Amino acid sequence: MIVKIIKGDITEIEAEAIVNAANSYLEHGGGVARAIVEKGGYIIQKESREYVRKYGPVPTGGVAVTSAGKLKAKYVIHAVGPRYGIEGEEKLEEAIRNALRKAEELKLSSIALPAISTGIYGYPYEICAEKMVKVIKEEYTNFKHLNTIIVSLYSEEAYNIFVNIFERELAKEKNITLKMSP
């Protein structure tokens, strides 16, 4: 398993799936969600609305899949993270776990994730990084297809926090190669 931590724009990453930090109604009006629709095209919002019409709102911790429009990825996996102080940290783990499992179910080899719930939902970067690395350590041995996880961070602050936590937590993991590119 290769885990890459990258400072940059998730919409520019070459991965088979990119994860969108979404709300339950898959209305992509702000943050990373808005950037994904702006770069990938309205088809992503259109498919998201069709999903919600057909299946109802995505519960916190859940995921939904759409095409990726004009993005380099094949799919967008919309993960609904929790709001800080309102919904528990276990829902953040669940959103990350479900996104990774969905990529494996789709037989994808690579996925890019943002710092889910750290924007308007208010989670500190430290908690998100700790939950993400915990889920990766718990799940990676179950994956037959997924072999590259890219964590894409927009700010210098987020990048530095994730690098420190991932270096500390993955130091003893022999089967995970950690790569960083600022």
From Swiss-Prot:
Domain Macro intervals: 1-170
What PANTHER family is this protein classified in? GANGLIOSIDE INDUCED DIFFERENTIATION ASSOCIATED PROTEIN 2-RELATED, MACRO DOMAIN-CONTAINING PROTEIN
**Name of this chain's protein:** Uncharacterized protein STK_23830
InterPro entries, A to Z: Macro_dom (IPR002589), Macro_dom-like (IPR043472)
Recorded hits in Pfam families, A to Z, give: Macro
Q: From which organism does this entry originate?
A: Sulfurisphaera tokodaii (strain DSM 16993 / JCM 10545 / NBRC 100140 / 7) (Sulfolobus tokodaii)
- Name the SMART domains on file: A1pp (SM00506)
